């Protein structure tokens, strides 16, 4: 009796492994600001991330969207790891924290986009919604996109009010929030 490979299980394993990698990366990259707990909105993004995986809508794997979805997921992992290597073991605060920025990263993916970590999460979630389309996954992605856009704006306000504001404004003008600026 030969074992058959179930493509749905392979895809689910791939996505779960990618999500675990991103989750472990987040836990080892982001720190809670002393005196603050993790913001509830941060927890919502994390829950949405995992809800996309466990949502039980059947998947049509003959869809032509699986390949670009897998490429997007690999891209999300590469972007996340590139950003982690670029900060050289330093820690970022959790989303929506109220700390004052003390460093402006401009190397690696930060040279092109201001929020490569958020961009990698959005790319991963968009990839899952593409590979395993369902209304629930699409709604979770849309909600996460709104929350992470709000988080990015919050970070931008913190930088604008910090001692780094004179460095941040030109940086903001030459980089995109989640995607590189095409025209300078």
Task: Enumerate the predicted regions with their spans.
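Histidine-centered phosphotransfer motif of kinases
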Residues: 106-107, 111-119
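Membrane-anchoring alpha-helices and their flanking helix-loop junctions
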Residues: 1-106, 124-184
């Amino acid at each position: 009796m030969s074992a058959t490979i179930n493509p749905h299980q392979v895809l689910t394993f791939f996505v779960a492994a990618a999500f675990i990698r991103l989750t472990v990366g987040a836990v080892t990259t982001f720190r809670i600001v002393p005196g603050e707990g993790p913001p509830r909105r941060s927890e919502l993004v994390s829950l949405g991330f995992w809800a996309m995986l466990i949502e039980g809508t059947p998947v049509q794997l003959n869809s032509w969207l699986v390949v670009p979805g897998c490429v997007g997921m690999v891209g999300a992992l590469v972007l996340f790891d590139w950003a982690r290597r670029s900060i050289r073991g330093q820690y970022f605060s959790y989303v929506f924290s109220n700390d004052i920025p003390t460093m402006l990263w401009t190397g690696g993916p930060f040279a092109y986009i201001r929020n490569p970590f958020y961009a990698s999460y959005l790319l991963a979630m968009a990839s899952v919604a593409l590979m395993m389309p369902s209304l629930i996954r699409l709604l979770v992605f849309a909600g996460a996109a709104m929350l992470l856009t709000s988080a990015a704006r919050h970070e931008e306000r913190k930088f604008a009010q910090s001692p780094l504001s004179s460095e941040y404004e030109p940086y903001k003008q030459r980089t995109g929030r989640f995607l590189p600026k095409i025209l300078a």
